[in-house]
Amino acid sequence: VHWSAEEKQL
């Protein structure tokens, strides 16, 4: 899956 940069902080 691919997520937004903000969710990559998790």
Swiss-Prot record:
Keywords, comma-separated and alphabetical: Heme, Iron, Metal-binding, Oxygen transport, Transport
Tissue-level expression: Red blood cells.
One example GO MF annotation: oxygen carrier activity
Subunit organization: Heterotetramer of two alpha chains and two beta chains.
Task performed by this protein: Involved in oxygen transport from the lung to the various peripheral tissues.
Family per similarity comment: Belongs to the globin family.
Protein's recorded name: Hemoglobin subunit beta-2
Organism, as annotated: Drymarchon melanurus erebennus (Texas indigo snake)
